[in-house]
Amino acid sequence: MTTSLLLHPRWPESLMYVYEDSAAESGIGGGGGGGGGGTGGAGGGCSGASPGKAPSMDGLGSSCPASHCRDLLPHPVLGRPPAPLGAPQGAVYTDIPAPEAARQCAPPPAPPTSSSATLGYGYPFGGSYYGCRLSHNVNLQQKPCAYHPGDKYPEPSGALPGDDLSSRAKEFAFYPSFASSYQAMPGYLDVSVVPGISGHPEPRHDALIPVEGYQHWALSNGWDSQVYCSKEQSQSAHLWKSPFPDVVPLQPEVSSYRRGRKKRVPYTKVQLKELEKEYAASKFITKEKRRRISATTNLSERQVTIWFQNRRVKEKKVVSKSKAPHLHST
């Protein structure tokens, strides 16, 4: 079985890769590629198996079996004119199922591609072969990832539409055999990082939360409930509520933290006598008078000013109370 792969790189001539499955089919694929020549140095791949083929690609120097190789053929075999240098680039990959595991040739080095190019690669994992591809702009129906099992896993079938692939760019899909060795541990959150964990083409966005085996804290004093602690106990200790009625949160001393009024210090009789004398002389104090009273009474100028203000308010209240009965009587 021979399948052609068409590429449109930046080179003057587009290239075609021929993928062969067995040595018996090598002669069939070699007949169509006899017209190619001079392009073997442009790409990389594996050496050919039949003498009638185009010059083989020995640039990579990779050792592959002669029954499973890719050869480089010139584009004019298809009967199409060569693509210009400035033409928009694109590449199309077609997945080829292989009956045997891990017998893939190394892909040729991809030329510098634009944002609409397709990158394909493969790597062996255990006894199986995984071939994955990053697609930016694909218009054909194809698989984003081909899995070639070793001996007991069949190849999952089903193709994805092109529009589904374009919306799921740079997405990997891994199949059940890869995740079968993983076992979710109880009490932990298993959030899916890769959108596609199973072989199903649709992406999976849910998170597995296996909590059936979860057990709360085992307290030594026999409490049968969970304990919740506040992260900001130092700042909001009064908001913390304990599920246990006998637990009381520690309350900090309010007097040490709260900025309240200073303790009232009463004036002495000598100070009050001096202040009353000055108030009787004048209800309003001047700057020079305030300094003199402050020096004689050992009080600050602010204290003297406040006392005079309070004294005027007190006198005003006394006068208003004395006038109130006189108004009611008339």
From Swiss-Prot:
<dbReference type="GO" id="GO:0003700">
    <property type="term" value="F:DNA-binding transcription factor activity"/>
</dbReference>
<keyword id="KW-0804">Transcription</keyword>
<feature type="region of interest" description="Disordered">
    <location>
        <begin position="30"/>
        <end position="50"/>
    </location>
</feature>
<dbReference type="InterPro" id="IPR009057">
    <property type="entry name" value="Homeodomain-like_sf"/>
</dbReference>
<feature type="DNA-binding region" description="Homeobox">
    <location>
        <begin position="260"/>
        <end position="319"/>
    </location>
</feature>
<dbReference type="InterPro" id="IPR022067">
    <property type="entry name" value="HoxA13_N"/>
</dbReference>
<keyword id="KW-0038">Ectodermal dysplasia</keyword>
<keyword id="KW-0217">Developmental protein</keyword>
<comment type="function">
    <text>Transcription factor which plays a role in hair follicle differentiation. Regulates FOXQ1 expression and that of other hair-specific genes.</text>
</comment>
<comment type="similarity">
    <text>Belongs to the Abd-B homeobox family.</text>
</comment>
<dbReference type="GO" id="GO:0009952">
    <property type="term" value="P:anterior/posterior pattern specification"/>
</dbReference>
<dbReference type="Pfam" id="PF00046">
    <property type="entry name" value="Homeodomain"/>
</dbReference>
<keyword id="KW-0539">Nucleus</keyword>
<dbReference type="GO" id="GO:0001228">
    <property type="term" value="F:DNA-binding transcription activator activity, RNA polymerase II-specific"/>
</dbReference>
<keyword id="KW-0371">Homeobox</keyword>
<dbReference type="Pfam" id="PF12284">
    <property type="entry name" value="HoxA13_N"/>
</dbReference>
<dbReference type="InterPro" id="IPR051003">
    <property type="entry name" value="AP_axis_regulatory_Homeobox"/>
</dbReference>
<dbReference type="GO" id="GO:0000785">
    <property type="term" value="C:chromatin"/>
</dbReference>
<dbReference type="GO" id="GO:0009653">
    <property type="term" value="P:anatomical structure morphogenesis"/>
</dbReference>
<dbReference type="GO" id="GO:0000978">
    <property type="term" value="F:RNA polymerase II cis-regulatory region sequence-specific DNA binding"/>
</dbReference>
<dbReference type="GO" id="GO:0000976">
    <property type="term" value="F:transcription cis-regulatory region binding"/>
</dbReference>
<dbReference type="GO" id="GO:0005634">
    <property type="term" value="C:nucleus"/>
</dbReference>
<dbReference type="InterPro" id="IPR017970">
    <property type="entry name" value="Homeobox_CS"/>
</dbReference>
<keyword id="KW-0238">DNA-binding</keyword>
<keyword id="KW-0225">Disease variant</keyword>
<dbReference type="InterPro" id="IPR001356">
    <property type="entry name" value="HD"/>
</dbReference>
<feature type="compositionally biased region" description="Gly residues">
    <location>
        <begin position="30"/>
        <end position="47"/>
    </location>
</feature>
<dbReference type="GO" id="GO:0035878">
    <property type="term" value="P:nail development"/>
</dbReference>
<dbReference type="GO" id="GO:0001942">
    <property type="term" value="P:hair follicle development"/>
</dbReference>
<protein>
    <recommendedName>
        <fullName>Homeobox protein Hox-C13</fullName>
    </recommendedName>
</protein>
<dbReference type="GO" id="GO:0000981">
    <property type="term" value="F:DNA-binding transcription factor activity, RNA polymerase II-specific"/>
</dbReference>
<dbReference type="GO" id="GO:0003682">
    <property type="term" value="F:chromatin binding"/>
</dbReference>
<dbReference type="GO" id="GO:0006357">
    <property type="term" value="P:regulation of transcription by RNA polymerase II"/>
</dbReference>
<dbReference type="GO" id="GO:0045893">
    <property type="term" value="P:positive regulation of DNA-templated transcription"/>
</dbReference>
<dbReference type="GO" id="GO:0043587">
    <property type="term" value="P:tongue morphogenesis"/>
</dbReference>
<dbReference type="GO" id="GO:1990837">
    <property type="term" value="F:sequence-specific double-stranded DNA binding"/>
</dbReference>
<keyword id="KW-0805">Transcription regulation</keyword>
<dbReference type="GO" id="GO:0140297">
    <property type="term" value="F:DNA-binding transcription factor binding"/>
</dbReference>
